[in-house]
From Swiss-Prot:
Disulfide-linked positions: none
Keyword Transferase listed: yes
Highest rank taxon of the organism: Bacteria
Biological processes per GO annotation: tRNA wobble position uridine thiolation
One Pfam short name: DsrE
Signal peptide: none
Its EC number(s): 2.8.1.-
Record function comment: Part of a sulfur-relay system required for 2-thiolation of 5-methylaminomethyl-2-thiouridine (mnm(5)s(2)U) at tRNA wobble positions. Accepts sulfur from TusA and transfers it in turn to TusE.
Record-linked InterPro entries: DsrEFH-like (IPR027396), Sulphur_relay_DsrE/F-like (IPR003787), Sulphur_relay_TusD/DsrE (IPR017463)
Protein name in the entry: Sulfurtransferase TusD
Keyword field contains Transferase: yes
Keywords: Cytoplasm, Transferase, tRNA processing
């Protein structure tokens, strides 16, 4: 089965993103195809490369990045939600006159079209 995941919670502070990550790993372990993860609302904080968890905590941002690198899972970030929350790539930082960007490598700023496409091409869309 082909799956897509929607994450609406931040990397830390709620269980949503952590549960989504564990679900993603379980899907892959069971032989399912995880096509994409779409980060929306507070979920865009999962793509902030400046996140620095305590040394005894799992680094969820880098975990998502590894999921992308090892399994080719697309990590799409809602551009409107990201800009409102200060998560920007180099292009947007330049366009907005910001000093730097903070979008973690492996994540892509995208519109809601990426979510619509995932919902049309996948068998299941699961939201956390």
């Amino acid at each position: 089965m082909r799956f897509a995941i929607v994450v609406t919670g931040p990397a830390y502070g709620t269980q949503q993103a952590s549960s989504a990550f564990q679900f993603a790993q379980a899907l892959i372990a069971e032989g399912h195809k995880l096509s994409s993860v779409f980060f929306y609302r507070e979920g865009v904080y999962n793509a902030n490369q400046l996140t620095s968890p305590a040394s005894d905590e799992f680094d969820l941002v880098r975990g998502w990045q590894q999921l992308n690198a090892q399994h080719g899972v697309a990590l799409n970030i809602c551009v409107a939600a990201a800009l409102r929350r200060g998560v920007v790539d180099e292009t947007e930082a330049g366009r907005l006159g910001l000093a730097s960007s903070n979008l973690q490598q492996g994540f892509t700023l995208s519109g809601l079209g990426a979510l619509a496409e995932a919902s049309l091409t996948c068998d299941r869309v699961v939201q956390f």
